[in-house]
Amino acid sequence: MTVNDAVVFILAAFLLWGAADYCLGNRWGLGERFADGFKAMGPLALSMIGIVSLAPVLAAILIPIVAPFYTAIGADPSSFANTILAIDMGGYALAGEMAKDPQAGLFSWVFLGTMMGPAIVFTIPVALGIIEKEDHPYFAKGILIGLCTVPIGCLIGGLCAGFDIGMIGKNLLIPSLLSAVIAFGLWRYTDRMIQLFHLFGKAVSMVAIIGLAAVSVETMTGIVLIPGMENVETGIQTTGTIAIALAGAFPMTAFITKTFKKPLQALGKCLHLDETATAGLVTSLAHHIPMLASLKDMTPRGKVINVAFAVSGAFVLGSHLGFVAGMKKEMAAAMIIGKLAGGVTAAAAAAWMTPAQSAKQQKRISASHS
């Protein structure tokens, strides 16, 4: 049995445990998380089915534009899609359509699509609607640090997956350059960059809904609104496969969080993090929205470390594990290693760049929030 097989069997075991707990009235707190996995099909369908169906159309538009430039530097066009899109928001579907080299396409959606893409299209736009305005500087600093370590996570994950280092390097050239540009923009023009990301996130969501509406009308009536779209069954099958994996991943994350609560709190103390910040890091392993919601209650150090870690580390035991295990289980272990490598190095850099505050300073911050 390979490591990837072991990961899938562990997910299956937690799925069964969650299902049993659901039948027994959520006695261990896993049944609710099991149900959450299948309930995720709705949001997944809204963001994915339209993009999956539109993938051939979008690829036909984008390939003539980006392919010559990427080919000139020896990179694959598929890495473009996952530099700006998460795997579950179009990155996976577009990588399949745009890839000239299947290995490069696989590398792109498994690693760039779980680190770089989610930060651009989801983390930054979504966070803006959650965090307090006074936390924008800490958020920008965390994103800046987190983006700088994305290439590290992709490199380590790619090597663990057995990809050629030359291919990895070529396909990380443009993402690394874009990371540097974004980092500079967040440093010098924070408010403008934040507005830009907000608009980009809205634009991607609109494209997804337009695609979903068009393929739904075509399925119901046979009337083709957008020629060249993939049939709706492909998107539905993809979301269903991911939901099955999530029904195991969510209970597993709940179990880890509960079982290792004390050791994780001890680790937080070593990093000079308060309890809220430590809990945020653990929560981000499954999903970072609860962490972002509690950002206002953290110290500045905790805020920066949490955001930096989330760029690569968020969803590693949640939807990204569910997606990769469902679509290409051979990549599951390497994806986990790569995302954690990117997240941990970002958190370490953030800890080094953001000094721990004195107890007196922390009391002052707590008083300002009470």
Swiss-Prot record:
Instruction: Give the record's membrane topology.
Output: Multi-pass membrane protein
For whether the record's keyword set contains Transport, the answer is yes
Q: Subcellular localization, per the record?
A: Cell membrane
> Could you tell me the keywords of this UniProt record?
Cell membrane, Membrane, Transmembrane, Transmembrane helix, Transport
The residues that cross the membrane are 6-26, 49-69, 79-99, 111-131, 143-163, 167-187, 206-226, 236-256, 307-327, 333-353
Entry GO terms, CC:
plasma membrane
Per its UniProt record, what InterPro entries does this chain match? EutH (IPR007441)
Q: What is its main location?
A: membrane
Annotated GO molecular function terms are: ethanolamine transmembrane transporter activity
Family, similarity comment: Belongs to the EutH family.
PANTHER family hit by this protein: ETHANOLAMINE PERMEASE EUTH-RELATED, ETHANOLAMINE UTILIZATION PROTEIN EUTH
Q: What protein name applies here? A: Uncharacterized protein YxeR
Q: Which organism is it from?
A: Bacillus subtilis (strain 168)
Identify the gene encoding this protein.
yxeR
